[in-house]
């Protein structure tokens, strides 16, 4: 089944949305194994309308992960990480994410874990978080989403929240039309969208 077939009603990202995929893995960084999860995430984001998403591979080093998140937050609306969310001593992606985020979006992480548990009880061991990095002097912020490192886990987790991400990015940008009030295929930046406060 294709990605598009699994999520046929997912709204598209706002036009011009910039996204970044960070693969966090010592072995991938050292070119000791191929990155198979990053391409899965990239394809899903492209299908949703992300504009030429960037990809970068990082080692499991807290400081380097945090620095990369802050660097990309200067230009990207969405950063998706894959890897480093488990219980191994060097799994520090959630810690790096918490370090740079001003607000956590617990509901997204809970939704991903709930969907993962439908496939495997091992999903309970994922510590991934989601949060927002505020932009200095600029309205809105960058949404950060932590995914597991396995291709299946990353794909399942991201698909669980794909339909929520466009509305989340609209809200961060100050466009507050309720998703339930938008016509099919219309985001809240579209002329004629109904605008209300809150979510």
Language model region names:
Residues 1-199:
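Non-catalytic beta/alpha edge segments that cap or flank active sites
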């Amino acid at each position: 089944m294709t990605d598009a077939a699994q999520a046929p009603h997912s709204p598209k990202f706002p036009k011009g949305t910039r996204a970044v995929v960070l693969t966090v893995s010592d072995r991938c960084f050292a070119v000791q194994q191929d990155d198979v999860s990053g391409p899965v995430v990239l394809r899903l984001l492209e299908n949703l309308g992300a504009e030429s998403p960037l990809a970068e591979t990082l080692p499991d080093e807290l400081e380097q992960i945090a620095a990369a998140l802050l660097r990309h937050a200067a230009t990207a609306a969405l950063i998706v990480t894959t890897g480093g969310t488990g219980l191994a001593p060097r799994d520090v992606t959630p810690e790096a994410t918490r370090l740079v985020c001003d607000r956590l979006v617990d509901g997204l992480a809970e939704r991903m874990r709930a969907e993962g548990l439908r496939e495997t009880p091992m999903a309970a061991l994922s510590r991934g978080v989601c949060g927002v990095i505020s932009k200095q002097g600029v309205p809105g912020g960058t949404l950060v989403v932590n995914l597991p490192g396995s291709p299946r886990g990353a794909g399942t987790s991201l698909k669980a929240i794909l339909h929520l991400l466009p509305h989340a990015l609209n809200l961060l940008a100050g466009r507050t039309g309720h998703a339930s009030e938008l016509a099919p295929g219309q985001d809240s930046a579209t002329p004629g969208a109904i605008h209300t406060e809150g979510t």
